[in-house]
Amino acid sequence: MATPITTIKKETKTAEQIKLEKIEELKELLAENEDAVSKTMTLMNELNDLGIFDAATSMLRAKEDIAKIALGQVSREPVTNLINTMMAAGGALTKADPEFTAKLLESVMAGTEQAQSFLKEDKKVGILDLLKAMNDPDINRAVGFGLQFLKGMGKELREQ
């Protein structure tokens, strides 16, 4: 009869054995992915030839100086004014009706096209032409819209 097992010995590998196993695994991965590894190495060589790695290394070494310069540029008054203006415009646009805004922009584009064709004609517009134009429903609608726009804008300016 065999003697019962009372202890289990766990096989421990030496550091050298672990290294050898990892090297073997790496060799297998390289062999399995030869094409990808080759393309990666080609890409790395191209980037190195272009000096990208040197530039990236220099930037990492100078990260504090770069951060100071960037912060200095961003904190200049014109830049902060631009940021504040964009935030205010964004806030105002969130209140706008998207469908009406799209229609308004389409109208502006159509008006711009019509105006460009007029500029090519080099035609003079007289006072009588303006009075006659008011009978045109499209012109009347645009003038009325413009007048009401100016009225609303004036009210808002007065309230501030």
From Swiss-Prot:
Source domain of life: Bacteria
Matching Pfam families: DUF1641
Family as reported in the entry's similarity comment: To A.fulgidus AF1717.
Full protein name: Uncharacterized protein YrhD
Annotated source species: Bacillus subtilis (strain 168)
Gene: yrhD
